[in-house]
Protein backbone atom coordinates (compact mmCIF):
# COMPACT_ATOMS: atom_id res chain seq x y z
CA UNK A 1 0.00 0.00 0.00
CA UNK A 2 1.37 3.42 -0.95
CA UNK A 3 2.05 5.88 1.85
CA UNK A 4 3.19 9.48 2.19
CA UNK A 5 6.83 8.36 2.38
CA UNK A 6 6.50 7.26 -1.24
CA UNK A 7 4.79 10.50 -2.27
CA UNK A 8 7.92 12.04 -3.77
CA UNK A 9 8.04 15.24 -5.80
CA UNK A 10 7.64 14.48 -9.51
CA UNK A 11 9.74 16.34 -12.07
CA UNK A 12 9.60 14.58 -15.46
CA UNK A 13 6.53 16.21 -17.03
CA UNK A 14 7.62 16.41 -20.68
CA UNK A 15 6.63 20.05 -21.05
CA UNK A 16 5.98 21.03 -24.66
CA UNK A 17 5.53 17.45 -25.83
CA UNK A 18 2.04 16.53 -27.00
CA UNK A 19 0.63 13.09 -26.36
CA UNK A 20 1.70 10.50 -28.89
CA UNK A 21 -1.68 8.83 -28.67
CA UNK A 22 -4.06 11.73 -29.39
CA UNK A 23 -5.66 11.98 -32.83
CA UNK A 24 -8.70 13.90 -31.56
CA UNK A 25 -8.92 17.56 -30.60
CA UNK A 26 -9.85 16.77 -26.99
CA UNK A 27 -6.94 15.53 -24.91
CA UNK A 28 -7.15 11.85 -24.00
CA UNK A 29 -10.37 11.21 -25.93
CA UNK A 30 -9.03 9.31 -28.95
CA UNK A 31 -10.42 5.97 -27.79
CA UNK A 32 -13.79 7.21 -26.55
CA UNK A 33 -17.11 6.16 -28.06
CA UNK A 34 -18.71 8.24 -30.81
CA UNK A 35 -21.28 9.67 -28.40
CA UNK A 36 -18.63 10.75 -25.90
CA UNK A 37 -16.60 12.43 -28.63
CA UNK A 38 -19.68 14.16 -29.99
CA UNK A 39 -20.57 15.59 -26.59
CA UNK A 40 -17.01 16.69 -25.88
CA UNK A 41 -16.93 18.38 -29.30
CA UNK A 42 -19.91 20.48 -28.26
CA UNK A 43 -17.95 21.72 -25.25
CA UNK A 44 -14.43 22.05 -26.70
CA UNK A 45 -14.00 23.94 -29.96
CA UNK A 46 -12.85 21.44 -32.62
CA UNK A 47 -10.52 24.07 -34.12
CA UNK A 48 -8.73 24.94 -30.87
CA UNK A 49 -9.51 22.21 -28.35
CA UNK A 50 -10.46 24.93 -25.86
CA UNK A 51 -13.61 26.00 -24.07
CA UNK A 52 -15.09 28.93 -22.18
CA UNK A 53 -17.56 27.44 -19.71
CA UNK A 54 -19.93 29.66 -17.74
CA UNK A 55 -20.52 28.23 -14.27
CA UNK A 56 -23.49 29.30 -12.17
CA UNK A 57 -24.11 26.23 -10.03
CA UNK A 58 -23.05 28.04 -6.84
CA UNK A 59 -26.62 28.23 -5.51
CA UNK A 60 -26.79 24.53 -4.73
CA UNK A 61 -24.53 25.12 -1.73
CA UNK A 62 -24.54 28.93 -1.33
CA UNK A 63 -28.12 29.94 -2.12
CA UNK A 64 -28.76 33.30 -3.86
CA UNK A 65 -25.21 34.60 -3.59
CA UNK A 66 -24.23 38.00 -4.98
CA UNK A 67 -24.65 38.16 -8.75
CA UNK A 68 -26.79 35.03 -8.88
CA UNK A 69 -29.93 36.36 -7.21
CA UNK A 70 -31.82 36.32 -10.53
CA UNK A 71 -30.43 33.87 -13.06
CA UNK A 72 -32.92 35.04 -15.68
CA UNK A 73 -31.73 38.64 -15.41
CA UNK A 74 -28.03 38.28 -14.61
CA UNK A 75 -26.92 35.08 -16.32
CA UNK A 76 -29.14 34.35 -19.32
CA UNK A 77 -27.88 37.45 -21.23
CA UNK A 78 -24.31 36.11 -20.88
CA UNK A 79 -24.99 32.58 -22.10
CA UNK A 80 -24.58 33.51 -25.76
CA UNK A 81 -20.90 34.34 -25.15
CA UNK A 82 -20.01 30.97 -23.58
CA UNK A 83 -19.15 27.67 -25.25
CA UNK A 84 -20.89 25.70 -22.51
CA UNK A 85 -22.94 26.36 -19.37
CA UNK A 86 -22.60 24.58 -16.02
CA UNK A 87 -25.61 24.56 -13.72
CA UNK A 88 -27.99 22.43 -11.68
CA UNK A 89 -31.09 20.75 -13.07
CA UNK A 90 -33.35 23.02 -11.02
CA UNK A 91 -31.95 26.19 -12.56
CA UNK A 92 -31.79 24.63 -16.01
CA UNK A 93 -35.47 23.77 -16.09
CA UNK A 94 -36.73 26.95 -14.41
CA UNK A 95 -34.49 29.72 -15.69
CA UNK A 96 -32.64 28.75 -18.88
CA UNK A 97 -34.53 28.90 -22.20
CA UNK A 98 -34.51 25.57 -24.02
CA UNK A 99 -33.62 27.28 -27.30
CA UNK A 100 -30.23 28.63 -26.18
CA UNK A 101 -28.51 25.89 -28.22
CA UNK A 102 -25.56 25.60 -25.81
CA UNK A 103 -24.10 22.39 -24.37
CA UNK A 104 -24.86 21.81 -20.70
CA UNK A 105 -22.46 20.47 -18.08
CA UNK A 106 -25.03 19.38 -15.52
CA UNK A 107 -24.14 19.56 -11.83
CA UNK A 108 -24.89 15.98 -10.91
CA UNK A 109 -24.19 15.71 -7.20
CA UNK A 110 -25.70 17.34 -4.14
CA UNK A 111 -24.80 17.52 -0.48
CA UNK A 112 -24.34 19.99 2.34
CA UNK A 113 -24.59 23.77 2.19
CA UNK A 114 -21.96 26.25 3.32
CA UNK A 115 -23.74 26.35 6.70
CA UNK A 116 -22.33 22.95 7.67
CA UNK A 117 -19.34 20.73 7.02
CA UNK A 118 -19.60 18.40 4.04
CA UNK A 119 -21.29 15.32 5.48
CA UNK A 120 -23.11 13.63 2.62
CA UNK A 121 -22.96 13.72 -1.14
CA UNK A 122 -25.37 11.96 -3.50
CA UNK A 123 -25.72 11.66 -7.26
CA UNK A 124 -28.71 12.50 -9.40
CA UNK A 125 -30.10 9.75 -11.62
CA UNK A 126 -28.37 9.30 -14.97
CA UNK A 127 -31.82 9.45 -16.58
CA UNK A 128 -32.06 13.11 -15.58
CA UNK A 129 -28.78 13.89 -17.34
CA UNK A 130 -30.20 12.21 -20.44
CA UNK A 131 -33.55 13.95 -20.02
CA UNK A 132 -31.85 17.35 -19.91
CA UNK A 133 -29.67 16.47 -22.90
CA UNK A 134 -26.51 17.02 -20.87
CA UNK A 135 -23.22 17.11 -22.74
CA UNK A 136 -21.36 16.33 -19.50
CA UNK A 137 -21.98 15.69 -15.81
CA UNK A 138 -20.05 17.51 -13.08
CA UNK A 139 -19.23 15.61 -9.89
CA UNK A 140 -17.09 16.72 -6.94
CA UNK A 141 -14.04 14.87 -5.65
CA UNK A 142 -12.85 16.05 -2.24
CA UNK A 143 -9.16 15.16 -1.97
CA UNK A 144 -7.60 15.19 1.48
CA UNK A 145 -10.94 15.24 3.33
CA UNK A 146 -10.73 12.36 5.79
CA UNK A 147 -14.50 12.15 6.13
CA UNK A 148 -15.51 12.51 2.51
CA UNK A 149 -12.62 11.57 0.22
CA UNK A 150 -13.70 7.94 -0.23
CA UNK A 151 -17.38 8.85 -0.55
CA UNK A 152 -16.80 11.48 -3.23
CA UNK A 153 -14.39 9.15 -5.06
CA UNK A 154 -17.09 6.47 -5.06
CA UNK A 155 -19.61 9.00 -6.41
CA UNK A 156 -17.20 9.96 -9.16
CA UNK A 157 -16.64 6.33 -10.13
CA UNK A 158 -20.38 5.66 -10.14
CA UNK A 159 -21.01 8.70 -12.34
CA UNK A 160 -18.28 7.59 -14.75
CA UNK A 161 -19.75 4.09 -14.93
CA UNK A 162 -23.19 5.50 -15.73
CA UNK A 163 -21.77 8.04 -18.15
CA UNK A 164 -19.80 5.40 -20.04
CA UNK A 165 -22.95 3.35 -20.38
CA UNK A 166 -24.78 6.21 -22.12
CA UNK A 167 -21.91 8.13 -23.71
CA UNK A 168 -21.94 11.12 -21.34
CA UNK A 169 -18.55 12.48 -20.17
CA UNK A 170 -17.96 13.31 -16.51
CA UNK A 171 -16.12 16.37 -15.24
CA UNK A 172 -14.36 15.80 -11.92
CA UNK A 173 -14.52 18.96 -9.81
CA UNK A 174 -11.67 19.07 -7.30
CA UNK A 175 -12.45 20.25 -3.79
CA UNK A 176 -9.25 20.16 -1.79
CA UNK A 177 -9.48 19.30 1.92
CA UNK A 178 -8.73 21.95 4.53
CA UNK A 179 -5.55 20.23 5.66
CA UNK A 180 -4.05 20.17 2.17
CA UNK A 181 -1.81 22.93 0.85
CA UNK A 182 -3.23 24.78 -2.15
CA UNK A 183 -0.22 24.16 -4.36
CA UNK A 184 0.63 22.40 -7.59
CA UNK A 185 1.57 19.16 -5.88
CA UNK A 186 -1.85 18.66 -4.35
CA UNK A 187 -3.89 20.06 -7.22
CA UNK A 188 -1.94 17.68 -9.45
CA UNK A 189 -2.83 14.81 -7.12
CA UNK A 190 -6.54 15.68 -7.04
CA UNK A 191 -6.70 16.21 -10.81
CA UNK A 192 -4.84 13.03 -11.62
CA UNK A 193 -7.05 10.98 -9.27
CA UNK A 194 -10.14 12.30 -11.09
CA UNK A 195 -8.66 11.28 -14.44
CA UNK A 196 -7.48 7.91 -13.13
CA UNK A 197 -11.04 7.22 -12.02
CA UNK A 198 -12.35 7.94 -15.51
CA UNK A 199 -13.24 11.63 -15.57
CA UNK A 200 -13.05 13.05 -19.11
CA UNK A 201 -12.56 16.65 -17.90
CA UNK A 202 -11.10 18.00 -14.66
CA UNK A 203 -11.96 21.32 -13.07
CA UNK A 204 -9.39 22.64 -10.61
CA UNK A 205 -7.67 25.83 -9.50
CA UNK A 206 -4.83 27.79 -11.02
CA UNK A 207 -1.70 27.96 -8.88
CA UNK A 208 2.04 28.49 -9.08
CA UNK A 209 3.48 25.59 -11.04
CA UNK A 210 0.15 24.93 -12.76
CA UNK A 211 1.98 23.65 -15.84
CA UNK A 212 2.76 20.52 -13.79
CA UNK A 213 -0.92 20.03 -12.96
CA UNK A 214 -1.95 20.26 -16.62
CA UNK A 215 0.92 18.16 -17.98
CA UNK A 216 0.36 15.33 -15.50
CA UNK A 217 -3.38 15.11 -16.19
CA UNK A 218 -4.21 12.97 -19.26
CA UNK A 219 -7.54 14.75 -19.87
CA UNK A 220 -8.39 18.46 -20.36
CA UNK A 221 -8.08 20.67 -17.29
CA UNK A 222 -10.29 23.75 -16.99
CA UNK A 223 -9.75 26.26 -14.23
CA UNK A 224 -12.22 27.46 -11.63
CA UNK A 225 -12.53 31.12 -10.82
CA UNK A 226 -12.34 31.04 -7.03
CA UNK A 227 -12.78 34.35 -5.24
CA UNK A 228 -14.05 37.33 -7.23
CA UNK A 229 -11.24 39.26 -8.92
CA UNK A 230 -11.08 42.60 -10.73
CA UNK A 231 -11.69 42.07 -14.45
CA UNK A 232 -8.09 42.67 -15.52
CA UNK A 233 -6.75 40.21 -12.93
CA UNK A 234 -9.33 37.62 -13.94
CA UNK A 235 -8.33 37.92 -17.60
CA UNK A 236 -4.65 37.66 -16.68
CA UNK A 237 -5.43 34.53 -14.66
CA UNK A 238 -7.16 32.96 -17.67
CA UNK A 239 -4.32 33.95 -20.01
CA UNK A 240 -1.68 32.47 -17.73
CA UNK A 241 -3.67 29.29 -17.18
CA UNK A 242 -4.09 28.62 -20.90
CA UNK A 243 -0.41 29.38 -21.50
CA UNK A 244 0.42 26.85 -18.79
CA UNK A 245 -1.68 24.10 -20.38
CA UNK A 246 -5.30 24.63 -19.34
CA UNK A 247 -7.86 23.69 -21.98
CA UNK A 248 -10.11 26.52 -20.89
CA UNK A 249 -11.99 28.05 -17.99
CA UNK A 250 -15.14 27.20 -16.07
CA UNK A 251 -15.86 30.40 -14.20
CA UNK A 252 -18.87 32.29 -12.94
Regions found by a protein language model. Give the residues of each.
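N-terminal amphipathic alpha-helix/helix-capping segment at the start of soluble metabolic enzymes
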Residues: 1-57, 90-101
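Alpha/beta enzyme core
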Residues: 46, 51-99, 103-223, 228-251
